[in-house]
Amino acid sequence: MATCLFLLGLFLLLPRPVPAPCYTATRSECKQKHKFVPGVWMAGEGMDVTTLRRSGSFPVNTQRFLRPDRTCTLCKNSLMRDATQRLPVAITHWRPHSSHCQRNVAAAKVHSTEGVAREAAANINNDWRVGLDVNPRPEANMRASVAGSHSKVANFAAEKTYQDQYNFNSDTVECRMYSFRLVQKPPLHLDFKKALRALPRNFNSSTEHAYHRLISSYGTHFITAVDLGGRISVLTALRTCQLTLNGLTADEVGDCLNVEAQVSIGAQASVSSEYKACEEKKKQHKMATSFHQTYRERHVEVLGGPLDSTHDLLFGNQATPEQFSTWTASLPSNPGLVDYSLEPLHTLLEEQNPKREALRQAISHYIMSRARWQNCSRPCRSGQHKSSHDSCQCECQDSKVTNQDCCPRQRGLAHLVVSNFRAEHLWGDYTTATDAYLKVFFGGQEFRTGVVWNNNNPRWTDKMDFENVLLSTGGPLRVQVWDADYGWDDDLLGSCDRSPHSGFHEVTCELNHGRVKFSYHAKCLPHLTGGTCLEYAPQGLLGDPPGNRSGAVW
């Protein structure tokens, strides 16, 4: 008896079972005009895996909700006050999530266009390649990117990379509201059936256009399982070398962007220690505005809610905790596609249908023709070398002048070379011709030529490499002409001072007796320009704008 009472007590302590949200409804219930569960059309919709864009066409019929016996499945939506809603026969395992939204901004650092595409494709939960011939076998020193390679965010990153040297900072907020998936053999949409019937029996060069027309309408894959809710994704492009010249790093700016995003959605107070640290950094670097206003080259995507897809809820002018709350409150009735699983379109055909294999080949061919290739054999610029960690990346030796990203550490730096020295009509001795030599000074360095004996019109073949100097503050470029005697009593015949500027210059200086001529070449370091190399100069990748394998590469 005591044992029974003990077991009864344990049973009463157990949590009450949560009722299943969906049930089989009677015919009379099914006749009532209930709405479908939110976002139900996204499962079964087509998608192009190279662009990650939904096609807007539906190979699967997600509108049918009545079974042959006229019953249906109805669900209680706890996120919409237990509203009763229909579930199509093509959908199963529908569940609302109780966690709603967490006010947290996830941050990530990305260093290449390929990395941006990879991040975009990370929302695919399964292996989309299964059953397709899409595993690139690139030639030596080539790297392929397929999924997401033509997505909007990857195109944004590619265009930036061809303008300048960039790092990318990603800030993301996600909310998950619902999840569901297609049944094992979902009913096909009538229009898709018609499109399949119109396809030629085989895929070859003469039928390629017909198959690609279907792919352009429906995509390469269809969505089989979804997590719906909302996502705000902001990718900020940061000019790597401009940051270095401003005394900042991409990590420092990225961290402060994340702090400002946290404040904008109410996840962090503006009195937090992190926020105060970023405010102090702004003062140190004399920034007049916020980090997100200073660094505003960005790509924004907002999924879910009634707002426009480019409305920036993290860094926009109206980005406030109240605006974020309004957006999250709209997600139960207007969810977006957060995560998903994909299957190739050809798997919807019966295995014995010969067009199944033809469509598989067509999809594989289309995807591979869209692959973007990174040319890792592309030569590095002068002074750079291939990274030991990544053969596709170039880097520099860390030094006082440049960092490992090959960025100059300060403005005004140039490589200075002085050469082509000659003099005319010198007069250094009374009884013989001049025994002339030169001294050349700049930035605390001194070079000296050899003596040209007994010649009033001497030439020197010396090439004086001052290497990397501060052009604007190194002082004048000074060339002195001397007449050699015994060393202690050498005579200074004249001096020539010039303030060097970038470019190639020929100089003629008049002396008391005769003249001296020379030339100098001052080449601004990469990412610097202007007369004294004080201005910033964007410097992108070598070659043409991004394209596919038949054109340019990343």
Swiss-Prot record:
Q: Which residues are glycosylated?
A: 204, 375, 548
Recorded consequence of changing residue 490 to N: Does not affect interaction with lipid membranes
The MACPF domain, residue ranges? 26-374
Enumerate the UniProt keywords alphabetically.
Calcium, Cell membrane, Cytolysis, Disulfide bond, EGF-like domain, Endosome, Glycoprotein, Lysosome, Membrane, Metal-binding, Secreted, Signal, Transmembrane, Transmembrane beta strand
Q: What happens when the gene is disrupted?
A: Mice are viable and fertile, but die of virus infections that are normally efficiently dealt with by the immune system. They cannot eliminate lymphocytic choriomeningitis virus, but die of the infection. Young mice are abnormally susceptible to mouse hepatitis virus. Cytolytic activity towards tumor cells and transplants is also severely reduced.
Tell me the leader sequence span. 1-20
Q: What does this protein do?
A: Pore-forming protein that plays a key role in granzyme-mediated programmed cell death, and in defense against virus-infected or neoplastic cells. Can insert into the membrane of target cells in its calcium-bound form, oligomerize and form large pores. Promotes cytolysis and apoptosis of target cells by mediating the passage and uptake of cytotoxic granzymes. Facilitates the delivery of cationic cargo protein, while anionic or neural proteins are not delivered efficiently. Perforin pores allow the release of mature caspase-7 (CASP7) into the extracellular milieu.
Name listed for the protein in its UniProt record? Perforin-1
Species in which this protein is naturally found: Mus musculus
